[in-house]
């Protein structure tokens, strides 16, 4: 095989694996409930709104634990002075 053919085969394999990984990630995402339509009975609308509320709660739920602690760590490092990381004297305004 030519080196160019090997390179294209490798790129094709990587692209295929990327699509497979993205496909598995989207399967874990909840699906939006189907709208029963305008002339639906009250029971169907109640089921739909209950399912829609559950769907919105799943998507917008707050995540605690490792994820929030990493966000806190990054914001602490970016903001600068916190209780655990006091400002150093070199970050103070220099007086000449």
From Swiss-Prot:
Q: Check the record and name the InterPro entries matching this protein.
A: Pancreatic_hormone-like, Pancreatic_hormone-like_CS
Q: GO terms for biological process?
A: feeding behavior; neuropeptide signaling pathway
Task: List Tyrosine amide occurrences by residue.
Answer: 64
**Which lineage ranks, top first, belong to the organism behind this chain?**
Eukaryota, Metazoa, Chordata, Craniata, Vertebrata
What is this protein identified as? Pro-neuropeptide Y
Q: Which GO terms describe its molecular function?
A: neuropeptide hormone activity; neuropeptide Y receptor binding
Q: Corresponding gene?
A: npy
Its subcellular locations are: Secreted
Recorded hits in Pfam families, A to Z, give: Hormone_3
Question: Per UniProt, which keywords does this protein have?
Answer: Amidation, Cleavage on pair of basic residues, Neuropeptide, Secreted, Signal
């Amino acid at each position: 095989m030519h080196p160019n053919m090997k390179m294209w085969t490798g790129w094709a394999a990587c692209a295929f694996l990327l699509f497979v990984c993205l496909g598995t990630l989207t399967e874990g995402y909840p699906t939006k409930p189907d709208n029963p339509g305008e002339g639906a009975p009250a029971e169907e609308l109640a089921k739909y709104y209950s399912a829609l509320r559950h769907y919105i709660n799943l998507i917008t739920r707050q995540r605690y634990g490792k994820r929030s602690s990493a966000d806190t760590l990054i914001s602490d490092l970016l903001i600068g002075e916190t209780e655990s990381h006091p400002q150093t004297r070199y970050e103070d305004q220099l007086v000449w």
